[in-house]
């Protein structure tokens, strides 16, 4: 494809028809990948800025890479801000300031659809069918809180299936972590009272809760029910301890405390979460592509991207001004369909101290990040020299597979760069064959759901299975690389600087064969365990070079081992998940009258094997092709297998 004009000349040509109105513009590279999205109050004036002579290096590189340009007119600046944020989230352009880690925060969910509800960990922005508390900064925060609540209030933590199948109390009852409602050790009314206490605690009404518990303790004491009174006393003590440890605040109720700091052109944004006056943890973020950007710009882009994914509190407290504050507030309100939002920068008082503390934490996080970043930079330079690369690696892909005699086979790819592992880029490849157990049990499932629990990772489309793949590492690698290079043809912006394959000389030939087939020349190396398969004696195989080893004490050797081990562990994890899922699905296969069609209908209707197990007989009969007698048989069989 020959392009007539690119770069600044292209922008000049677009200026002729560019309107003097607000809107959003998009720059594309030669492969028509979006490389930058920008907003403007006046599109013509903004584009004119790109043909000036005093541009910074980042902008010059961006313009040099621009081969196509499009723009959209909007009705208002808020609409332009909103569209820009949505397009950045969708395309992740490399020259935009990006929030890489955008996974949603976890919540504590209290079920409301059971006589004896339990508390669960929940992750997702859609909050329905229950009472939710949070968000929390990490799963660790949620798990710690759940453990403390279970000790204090002793609500059940088991699944409905386990609950319904009990004939005697389980271990949780014996260690005083549950009141065993499954076998009638507590009645519904008393259990509901406990649930109400949990709600009060999680909603921050701890003072009222402790007052009510104190009154109840006195009543029980006056009735000579000293054992029950002592239990309430212990609960009050435990609540006081948890409050002290959690850092309850009377300064803010529902708020996010957000501080931004900068050092050597790198930024850290630290977020502290407060809900119902309780600290719910903190987490640092390190936005990318911030070269030549100001704090105002970085913080504005952070807020717009962050609150596309996260729940918005009543108040956002920040430590630095942002551009277009009122329009940012309106955009966040529209994104989240809310009517009220307050963003403030406190000058003095308790809130100012909170945001100052967040800034101190942000600076510490940034310093730790920069140390790690500098080490990675040094290692990347060594990798460039060791493997004869033309440039310092921005992206390294590491491949491995896992199987048991060819069954439940998966291939994986993990990705590393200058900032460490990029887990959003990890991939899982299903390599099931017609003869494998996984194939026979998992056939009703889409490739997207084939590996249970790996929803954070993409599974490449499954190619037609081969009967001769069983136990053949070379064929597995051939399939993985064929599918990966096919995708790279459509995603040239994700071409790795280096591929590392867990394997030896034979694997080297397979990689070369697939590379030649696709007419691609990506640098690659095969890394094998070496003599006696001992760690530290790894051998490296490259085309046209003698096999070589490295001193096991060298930092680069330790780094390469970390890369290899990450891929290996990821492969084993997904192999086990696939094997576990296949074993579970076999319970459906054992039921007379359940063939592939009905099994597929069950999984499609309920969404997962666990949901099928949790279903009642009446719910099972709602599935097309499942009558009452078959539903009863399914219910009995699944509950017998649990």
Curated annotation (Swiss-Prot):
Keywords, comma-separated and alphabetical: Cytoplasm, DNA damage, DNA excision, DNA repair, Excision nuclease, SOS response
Ranges where the GIY-YIG domain occurs: 20-97
Location relative to the cell: Cytoplasm
GO cellular component terms given for this protein: cytoplasm; excinuclease repair complex
Keyword Plastid among record annotations: no
Biological processes annotated in GO: nucleotide-excision repair; SOS response
Pfam families per UniProt: GIY-YIG, HHH_5, UVR, UvrC_RNaseH, UvrC_RNaseH_dom
A GO term, aspect molecular function: excinuclease ABC activity
UVR domain location: 207-242
PROSITE patterns in the record: GIY_YIG, UVR, UVRC
Major subcellular location class: cytoplasm
CDD domains: GIY-YIG_UvrC_Cho
Keyword Zinc-finger (UniProt): no
NCBIfam families the UniProt entry points to: RPE4 (TIGR03777), uvrC (TIGR00194)
Function: The UvrABC repair system catalyzes the recognition and processing of DNA lesions. UvrC both incises the 5' and 3' sides of the lesion. The N-terminal half is responsible for the 3' incision and the C-terminal half is responsible for the 5' incision.
Assembly description: Interacts with UvrB in an incision complex.
Designated name of the protein: UvrABC system protein C
Lineage, highest ranks first: Bacteria, Pseudomonadati, Pseudomonadota, Alphaproteobacteria, Rickettsiales
